[in-house]
């Protein structure tokens, strides 16, 4: 019984990892409250672990956790190289910087590839615009001198902004072509309307002329009929006059014979 030690009384704790961690954090807070009255014990703890001038002061928590998970934990302080547990910090820092550089180079390579793809797409689009086929627009048929003059004036007055190689010039060229097509269509429609309006006038004139001719024919027919009637009447009168004269002559002859 005289050889009893702490090992003889030790038994493993029945709590799980979460409860143990909570008990450890509460123990840290309780021990802090026993000698300091500030409301931020864990910030006080971090400030004591990473004082000003420490190599890990400017690093993020994620970087420190990944490094300490992979390698042995370094002791804090302004002179971390003087502790026995610290290994060559400069070598570890160089390794960490190399890893950061590798990550940065990978991101830079990805950005370079994306930029190259964008440049290639732009060149392909410009080549397509340069090599696109020129569409032959079907113009409306010229039906009068005014139409011809309008078309020639449009060709001379249209400004040539740029060639078809550039993107802005192509857009302007297409807009101008659309406007020209619209104007030519409007001119064609106006000409059709004018021709449609002119045809009924010709028909009316033709109809009026035909009616006048018919009237004239009717008048000529009427005059011929009236002339025939007049001739017939004159003939009848002549016949009657001749018959009367013959009767008078016969009566005179009879009277002469009787005497």
Swiss-Prot record:
The keyword Coiled coil applies. This is Uncharacterized ORF3 protein. Signal peptide: none annotated. It comes from Torque teno midi virus 1 (isolate MD1-073). Residues 192-259 are annotated as: Disordered. Residues 82-128 form a coiled coil. Residues 228-240 have a biased composition (Basic residues). Residues 241-259 have a biased composition (Low complexity). The keyword Coiled coil applies. InterPro entries: DUF755 (IPR008474), HEV_TT_vir_Orf2/Gyrovir_Vp2_N (IPR004118). Keywords: Coiled coil.
């Amino acid at each position: 019984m005289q050889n009893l030690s702490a090992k003889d009384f030790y038994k493993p704790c029945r709590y799980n990892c979460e409860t143990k961690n909570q008990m450890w954090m509460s123990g840290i807070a309780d021990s802090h409250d026993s000698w300091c009255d500030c409301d931020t014990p864990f910030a006080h703890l971090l400030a004591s672990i990473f004082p000003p001038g420490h190599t890990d002061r400017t690093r993020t928590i994620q970087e420190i956790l990944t490094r300490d998970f992979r390698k042995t934990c370094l002791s804090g302080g302004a002179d971390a190289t003087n502790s026995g547990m610290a290994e060559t910090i400069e070598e570890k820092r160089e390794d960490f910087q190399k890893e950061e550089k590798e990550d940065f180079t990978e991101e830079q390579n990805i950005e370079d590839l994306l930029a190259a793809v964008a440049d290639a797409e732009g060149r392909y689009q410009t080549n397509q615009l340069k090599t696109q086929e020129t569409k032959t627009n079907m113009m409306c048929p010229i039906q009068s001198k005014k139409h011809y003059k309008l078309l020639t004036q449009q060709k001379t007055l249209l400004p040539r902004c740029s060639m078809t190689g550039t993107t802005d010039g192509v857009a302007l060229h297409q807009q101008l072509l659309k406007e020209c097509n619209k104007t030519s269509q409007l001119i064609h429609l106006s000409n059709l309307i004018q021709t449609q309006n002119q045809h009924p006038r010709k028909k009316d004139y033709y109809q009026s002329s035909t009616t006048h001719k018919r009237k004239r024919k009717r008048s000529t027919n009427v005059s011929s009929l009236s002339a025939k009637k007049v001739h017939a009447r004159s003939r009848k009168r002549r016949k009657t006059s001749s018959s009367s004269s013959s009767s008078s002559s016969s009566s005179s002859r009879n009277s002469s014979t009787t005497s």
